[in-house]
Amino acid sequence: MSVFEPKSLLEQMQNAEYIFGIALRHTLSAVNGIYVTPGPFSLYRRSVLDELGGFRHAHQAEDMEMALRIQRAGYEIENAPRARVYTKVPRTVPSLIKQRTRWTTGFLRNVLTDYRDLVGNPKYGVLGLLVLPLGFVSIMGGVALFFVALYETGTQLVKLYLLSSGVPLSYTLMPRFSFELFYIPVTFIAVISLVVTVISIGFILVGRSVSNTSASLTLSIIGYTFLYVLIAPFWLIRSITDVVTGTRRAWR
């Protein structure tokens, strides 16, 4: 699944994210760990849908709920990475946050209510022991990393300013500021962020290869690298808050 004619940097960011998703689903399909069958161009066996009772309302994440129900019933979900299907994506940050809040709350509510028996259950293999638990870890970890990064960034900026405003060898008592590479802090958060970024870009390039995508991804990777980390925490925090408080939002 690819973004239809991405133009703005925000759309390019989502294009990289969707190609990342291609690589992720390709990997998960090898171990029967797919937990969502995307709405666009997912194909189902009629007999399986009849057996399982068809689609039903599922916290505005019906495609995810159906995939989890299929997995619970013991069936396998396959992935065709080169199947070509396009989707239009949100063009503004507020609409993107609203969409991703719906997706994230759908995951949390489905897994925490109807399908919590799958989590940590060896009967469901990689899906139960790794994929679903890591889904929780990535959501909670993303929020925690965001707040820790804010704190460390603020602390380091203050230290950097104080260091660069020192008076030795200066003939003025007025504060001065200059950018010095020597003062750039190498923190645990910085290292983790760099590792995650490199792995993400690697997955994007793998997704491009397995899906046979020929278009240049330079702008998409730039958008993904610099925009995603700024926007994603907002829908993660909003999603957790909605689940905890029981808030229900409209589809649009």
What are these regions (language model features)?
Residues 58, 67-86:
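Catalytic donor-sugar/metal-binding loop of nucleotide-sugar-dependent glycosyltransferases
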